[in-house]
C-alpha cells in the first residue's frame, strides 16, 4: 500500500518518502529504514517481560525523527506503527510539537486497545471508554503482541490514550465501515474517520462474464 501511494505521488510530481521498520526499501524508493535487528530484539523482549509494545526503540526513533526534521514533510501518513520498531511517545510528541498534518490509516485495532490488535473472537469490549478501558487482559499471553510475563493492558490503554489524542490536524482512515465504527466508539473518536477500501490489482481480479459465473 505504501509503495503504491509513493509511486502515485511521484507520478503526480510530488516529493515522497517511505519510512519502514522492516528489511530494506525497494529499489528506487527514497526513504529511511528505522532501527536494526538488535533493537528489534530488545523491543520484543521488553514487551515479553513488561508488556510494553510500542514503548521501546527510543534511540532508533530519535534518529528517525532527526531524519524527518531534515525532510520537513508537509504531511505524514502513518500506517501500522506497532511491530517493535518505534517509540510511540516520541513520535506523537514530535507530531504535536511541529503541528504536522497527519493521516493515519488503521489496519487493525491495536491503536485503541491496551494490548491486542483484534478482540472480536473473544467478544471483548473492555476497550470502550464506557467500560473503563482495557484491564485484566485474558489474551495477553496468547495474542499478539504476546506479553508473556505481565499483563500491562491497563497501563498501556491509559498511556496510549494520552499519546494518541490531542493531535490538532489528524484524520483517521480505515479500510472498512466496520473498523470505522469501532474507532468511533474508542478514545480516538475525537478525530474524523474516512473509509477508503483497500485497492486490488485489476490485472488479476476482474468481473466474471455471465458464462464464467455459471461454470
Kindly give the residue locations of the regions a language model identified.
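Carbohydrate-associated surface elements
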Residues: 178, 199
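Membrane-proximal helix-turn-helix segments that form the acceptor-binding/catalytic region
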Residues: 96-97, 110, 127-172, 187, ...
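A short, histidine- and acid-enriched strand-loop-helix "catalytic/donor-clamping" loop
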Residues: 80-85, 106-117, 140-148
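Short aromatic-enriched loop/helix-cap "lid" or pocket-rim segments at secondary-structure transitions
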Residues: 27-32, 90, 114-119, 124, ...
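Short N-terminal targeting/anchoring amphipathic segment
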Residues: 65-86, 100-107
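A short helix/loop element that forms part of the nucleotide-sugar donor recognition site in Leloir-type
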Residues: 157-160, 206-215
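N-terminal subdomain of nucleotide-sugar transferases
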Residues: 1-31, 69-71, 96-101, 168
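A short, charged, and often flexible helix/loop element on the N-terminal side
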Residues: 29-62, 80, 143-152
Amino acid at each position: 500500500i505504501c509503495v503504491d501511494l509513493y509511486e502515485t505521488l511521484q507520478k503526480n510530481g510530488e516529493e515522497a518518502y517511505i519510512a519502514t521498520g522492516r528489511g530494506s526499501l525497494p529499489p528506487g524508493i527514497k526513504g529511511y529504514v528505522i532501527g536494526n535487528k538488535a533493537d528489534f530484539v530488545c523491543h520484543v523482549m521488553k514487551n515479553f517481560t513488561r508488556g510494553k509494545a510500542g514503548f521501546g526503540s527510543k534511540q532508533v526513533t530519535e534518529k528517525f525523527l532527526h531524519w524527518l526534521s531534515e525532510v520537513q514533510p508537509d504531511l505524514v501518513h502513518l500506517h501500522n506503527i506497532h511491530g517493535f520498531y518505534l517509540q510511540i511517545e516520541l513520535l506523537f510528541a514530535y507530531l504535536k510539537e511541529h503541528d504536522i498534518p497527519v493521516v493515519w490509516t488503521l489496519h487493525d485495532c491495536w491503536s485503541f486497545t491496551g494490548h491486542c490488535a483484534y478482540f472480536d473472537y473473544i467478544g471483548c469490549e473492555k476497550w470502550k471508554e464506557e467500560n473503563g478501558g482495557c484491564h485484566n487482559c485474558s489474551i495477553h499471553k496468547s495474542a499478539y503482541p504476546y506479553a508473556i510475563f505481565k499483563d500491562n493492558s491497563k497501563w498501556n490503554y491509559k498511556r496510549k490514550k494520552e499519546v494518541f489524542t490531542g493531535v490538532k490536524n489528524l484524520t483517521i482512515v480505515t479500510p472498512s465501515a466496520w473498523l470505522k465504527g469501532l474507532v468511533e466508539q474508542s478514545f480516538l473518536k475525537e478525530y474524523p474517520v474516512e473509509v477508503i477500501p483497500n485497492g486490488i490489482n485489476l490485472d488479476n481480479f476482474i468481473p466474471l462474464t455471465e458464462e464464467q459465473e455459471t461454470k
